[in-house]
Amino acid sequence: PKRAFDKAIANSKKVAMSLSDLFCVERHRLNFLELVKNRLDIIFANEQEILSLINAKTFDEAISFSKEIKKNVIITRGEKGAISINQNEISEIKAKSDLKIKDLTGAGDLFAAGYLHGVINNFDVKDCLIKGTELSSKIIQKIGARI
């Protein structure tokens, strides 16, 4: 992974990563923290993952951390929606309501895909959040991780 990061950085590309798994974050916390602080430009995490990463108890601590590292941190919060923090710019979106949730498999991945689709197409942050929410809302209403 280090060579891939080095190559992307050398080519002036943005590097995005999802923390993806609470167990991995807890087990490899210091490695993840180094990546988040020093190697990544865009970080995706759910609320539990970001709190575990920084040993925080409150969501306000996660927001403060995200502002301090000066990266684009996107945190999904389930029924509370999602938030993007990039230095002092904070954008939030509510979760869609009245969904028939069947399976959460792939929700974070599809959210990240939608958000990144917005980034590469020069959407503003709010529209990136909307696209991510749109895709994740579709996948959780099906069994399995394919739309």
What do the predicted segments below correspond to?
Residues 68, 72, 96-147:
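Conserved post-catalytic alpha-helical subdomain immediately downstream of the catalytic base
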Residues 1-91, 123:
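Ribokinase/PfkB-type carbohydrate-kinase core domain
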